[in-house]
């Protein structure tokens, strides 16, 4: 799986729950909330003041190990 800024967080977590650590690191601790699971990575980054491109790159680097 390749992650983009348009990837829905819930879909990503369903495929690899270990990616939750990246969202916790940006202060997104409500991953079980239906609203957050429906957000894209870009939307979550906008709310949490984080660079979406950097987060996507970090997640993709992590996923390459699988």
Where are these regions (language model features)?
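Domain-level signature for proteins that mediate thiol-based redox and metal-cofactor handling
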Residues: 1-66
């Amino acid at each position: 799986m390749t992650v983009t800024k348009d990837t829905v967080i819930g879909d990503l977590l369903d495929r690899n729950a270990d990616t939750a650590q990246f969202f916790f690191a940006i202060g997104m601790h409500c991953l079980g909330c239906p609203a957050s699971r429906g957000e894209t990575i870009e939307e979550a980054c906008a709310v949490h003041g984080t660079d979406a491109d950097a987060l996507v790159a970090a997640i993709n680097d992590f996923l390459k190990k699988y």
